[in-house]
């Protein structure tokens, strides 16, 4: 189960960069062999894990393209927790979408044989042009697990109150960038409900270079930042 949530964390990192109005102008690094390495830290700044995402291939379609991404993740000790999991980034008629369902299902299938799994949701979007004060749409995702037509467990994720606060220069381990700062609220419900507040910094043609999550008391719970960008 821990690996499932690792995948969810990684994939939501990439969903910060999707859905441009032009397939060639997305907040996403759409070039073959591009590799983005990120590091995760707890609220006290202690390393909790790293992940790598590589654009393996890009294929043109009648209305856009399909890019295949490969994700690898390691814990703080360098041990793999998610190894070589693929998902597709699909651009169709100017909208980019993530097809991460198969990645969830492949990981869950190995841990929960005999379980029936369904995934649904609206996703999130990022317009090709951002401006300070701009309000962005909400998004959600549900993962249901069951057997013989009965649901045993439902995981719900919803993102709301997304807003572009400002554009600012920010420095991470990978370098200094002009980034858009976006804030939002996220509700997660698995065995219990948890609400967090988050901040993300997005850079055109790269994606999210940093994020911070805070608990209901406003205390920093974790940070993710890009430590290497190879293209």
Residue ranges and their predicted role:
Residues 15-16, 33:
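N-terminal processing/targeting junctions
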Residues 18, 22, 119-120:
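General secondary-structure propensity
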Residues 21-87, 142-231:
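Acidic, serine/threonine-rich low-complexity disordered tracts
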Residues 4-15:
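Sec-dependent N-terminal signal peptides
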Residues 29-31, 91-95, 99-177:
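Solvent-exposed helix/loop surface patches that form functional interfaces
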């Amino acid at each position: 189960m821990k690996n499932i949530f690792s995948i969810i964390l990684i994939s939501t990192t990439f969903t910060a960069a999707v859905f441009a109005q032009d397939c060639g102008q997305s907040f996403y690094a759409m070039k073959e062999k591009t590799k983005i390495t990120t590091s995760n830290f707890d609220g006290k700044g202690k390393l909790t894990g790293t992940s790598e995402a590589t654009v393996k291939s890009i294929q043109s379609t009648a209305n856009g393209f399909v890019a295949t991404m490969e994700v690898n993740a390691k814990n703080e000790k360098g041990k793999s927790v998610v190894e070589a999991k693929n998902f597709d980034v699909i651009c169709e008629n100017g909208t980019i979408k993530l097809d991460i369902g198969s990645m969830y299902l492949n990981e869950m299938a190995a841990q929960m044989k005999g379980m029936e799994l369904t995934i649904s949701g609206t996703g999130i979007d990022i317009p090709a042009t951002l401006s300070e004060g701009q309000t962005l749409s909400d998004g959600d995702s549900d993962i249901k697990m069951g057997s013989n037509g009965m649901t045993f467990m439902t995981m719900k994720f919803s993102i709301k109150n997304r807003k572009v606060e400002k554009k600012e220069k920010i420095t991470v381990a990978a370098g200094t960038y002009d980034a858009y700062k976006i804030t939002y609220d996220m509700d997660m419900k698995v065995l219990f409900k948890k609400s967090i507040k988050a901040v993300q910094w997005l850079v055109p043609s790269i994606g999210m270079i940093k994020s911070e999550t805070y608990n209901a008391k406003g205390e920093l719970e974790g940070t993710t930042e890009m430590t290497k960008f190879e293209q």
